[in-house]
């Protein structure tokens, strides 16, 4: 259910941006996977521009990447990320980039973290969330950065995704596990 995931993040970020004077540029970095790609790259920029806000959007992503892998990459400096940055509507892309370089690339106002969709309702898969959050806060050039959670919602009830078995192919079980 990419639509719900995207909607939640966009809604949250738009509220965050809405209170900001339009003359200020708000810098948002997503650390995630293909769901973050959809949410921040395909929708957020246009929504903010429509209300007169200016954004710099960064997306550090690895398709299907779980939190534990993001944490391992932070510890090892592995150059595993595709990093896309949108400034003034122009997108630049860097491949094989490490997380520290991306986080230090700008004075991010907001950094979102995201679990791989299929693990989002499994609490034991969040073992390194606090460390990852503390890590990005520590190395971000903006000492007042807000770290937010990008919640991935349950797959469609008729999903054939193999990981849906973790939730007995039931959206309700998945959604309740995220509460």
Sequence positions of predicted segments:
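N-terminal secretory signal peptides that target proteins for export/translocation
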Residues: 1-3
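Sec-dependent N-terminal signal peptides
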Residues: 5-16
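Boundary at the C-terminal end of the N-terminal hydrophobic targeting segment
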Residues: 20-24
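Conserved SGNH/GDSL esterase-like catalytic core that processes O-acyl groups on lipids
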Residues: 26, 38-129, 156
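Alpha-helical cap/lid subdomain in secreted, periplasmic
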Residues: 96-179
């Amino acid at each position: 259910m990419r639509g719900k995931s995207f909607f939640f993040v966009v809604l949250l970020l738009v509220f965050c941006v809405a209170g900001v004077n339009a003359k200020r540029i708000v810098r948002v970095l997503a650390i995630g996977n293909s769901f973050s790609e959809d949410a921040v790259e395909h929708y957020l920029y246009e929504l903010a521009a429509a209300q007169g806000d200016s954004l710099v959007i960064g997306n550090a992503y690895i398709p299907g990447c779980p939190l534990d892998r993001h944490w391992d990459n932070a510890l090892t400096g592995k150059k595993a990320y595709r990093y896309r940055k949108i400034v003034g509507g122009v997108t630049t892309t860097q491949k094989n980039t490490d997380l520290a370089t991306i986080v230090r690339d700008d004075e991010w106002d907001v950094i979102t973290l995201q679990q791989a969709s299929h693990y989002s309702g499994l609490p034991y898969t969040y073992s390194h969330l606090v460390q990852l959050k503390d890590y990005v806060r520590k190395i971000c050039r903006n000492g007042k950065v807000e770290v937010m959670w990008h919640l991935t919602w349950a797959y469609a009830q008729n999903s054939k995704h193999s990981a849906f078995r973790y939730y007995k192919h039931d959206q309700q079980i998945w959604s309740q596990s995220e509460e």
